Amino acid sequence: MTYNDFITEIWLAVGNCPKSWRKGQKVFNTIEDLYGNVAREVQLIDGVDCFYDDRDETINLFIDKCWYRMCSTNLKK
């Protein structure tokens, strides 16, 4: 999977989230659903959380950190 594939998959899935959810909440829950605990690791270990923060810069940083963690985990295998 490339970074662009990752981004595309997230935003396609975000489009299917409940309309009542905030943008950051949609991104966080989508990544958690698709990729497991990487969202929680970024939230709790890296200190980047978009669940309650809908600013684009926070969401983009959260997505980038998730991608980095996923790539780092795959390199260790």
Across the structure, where does each feature detected by a protein language model lie?
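C-terminal alpha-helical interaction appendages
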Residues: 1-77
